[in-house]
Amino acid sequence: SSAASDVYKRQMLVDLTVKEFLNKVAGSDPVPGGGSIAALNGAIASALAAMVANLTIGKKGYELHEELMRHISGVALQQKGAFVEDIDRDSEAYDKVFACFKMPKATDEEKAARSTAIQEATKFAALVPMQVARNAYELMTVIMDVARLGNRNAVTDACVAMMSARSAVLGALMNVRINLGSLKDKEFVSKLQSEADELEHLACAKEKELLDEINQELKV
């Protein structure tokens, strides 16, 4: 269908300049929307975490953590690559759902095929942001280490990374929840719903833990 082929015709979001990307978000098209922005927040968090690690490697007084910082830099860059792919994946998942809604529904057979296709595409549209949320939460543990043990001159950058990662988790989970609302597979819904609730709680707690610590450290 033409909507499905639009997925392949559309320019990759990640190849746009920052200005072009923001203009696209501000446009009247529903994608890129919150899901792609959640993935972008994850990519920003990863990039900042890598930066703080790289600013620590080879610095006097941080020799003890050199190996850990090299590891963190590698992990963060790997995560960044995954989040960058998810910026487009989220918009493509939306396009798939939209394409299914345009399927013919003249006969009972067509109606059944359309309904099944919508359900499957919606499941996928919930699973894409779910993975973003899981990855962003995993990244928060890495950020915690880099914030506590990394270069003190870059500690606020690590805090911004933590806030961006929390935004990625919570934003992605919003997109999970909106897709769960129209699914008939109650077992699938309940499983993702409880994982989403737990991830949200854990992400907020981890962010608060770090920010409380660092705000204490920065007090004058």
For the regions a language model picked out, list residue spans one by one:
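Acidic-glycine-rich active-site phosphate/pyrophosphate-binding loop
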Residues: R10-V25, R134-D145
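Short, small-residue-biased leader/transition segments that mark boundaries at the very start
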Residues: S1-Y8
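Conserved phosphate/anionic-ligand binding catalytic regions in large, soluble enzymes, centered on
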Residues: G27-A50, N153-A172
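Amphipathic alpha-helical interface segments
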Residues: D90, Y94-M163, S167
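Amphipathic alpha-helix face/heptad-repeat signature
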Residues: L40-I44, I72, Q79-D86, A125-N135, ...
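Preference for long, well-ordered alpha-helical segments
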Residues: L139-V142, A154-I214, V220
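Transmembrane signal-anchor/signal-peptide helices with a preference for the extracytoplasmic
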Residues: M51-E63
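A structural-propensity feature for long, helix-poor, extended segments
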Residues: K60-C100, L199, K206
